[in-house]
């Protein structure tokens, strides 16, 4: 299927959900670009803001490093960052648990 949407996906366990990623692309035309930390995902969003249509956020995620314990701090920072970008482009985000 032709890609309709490009979505940043921030989840510390995305590698365990490859079937979900494949289904999104093949059946729904949603390309998910995974990141394990909020820092890396938000840096990509900043670099290529106009290329992204949405963001999926894991409720408990790594903030800046995979050496951390996943917790809500990364989620709060990501939401705050996305909200700050709304003056440039409104990006919908979805929280997954």
Descriptions of predicted regions:
Residues 61-76:
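Short, flexible/disordered intra-domain loops and linkers
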Residues 55, 76-97:
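A short, hydrophobic beta-strand element within the central beta-sheet of small alpha/beta folds
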Residues 2-25:
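Conserved acidic segment of CheY-like receiver
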Residues 23-29, 46-49, 80-88:
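Short, surface-exposed basic-aromatic patches at helix termini and helix-loop junctions that form
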Residues 7, 32, 92-94:
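Hydrophobic/aromatic residues located in beta-strands of well-ordered beta-sheets
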Residues 10-12, 58, 95-97:
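Short His-Asn-centered micro-motif
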């Amino acid at each position: 299927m032709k890609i309709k949407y490009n979505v940043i996906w921030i989840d510390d366990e995305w590698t365990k959900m490859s079937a979900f990623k494949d289904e999104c692309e093949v059946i729904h035309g949603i390309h998910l670009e995974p990141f394990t930390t909020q820092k890396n995902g938000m840096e990509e969003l900043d670099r290529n803001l106009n290329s992204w249509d949405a963001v999926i956020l894991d409720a408990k995620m790594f903030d800046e490093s995979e050496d951390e314990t996943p917790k809500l701090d990364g989620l709060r920072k990501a939401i705050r960052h996305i909200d700050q970008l709304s003056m440039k482009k409104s990006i919908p985000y979805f929280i997954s648990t």
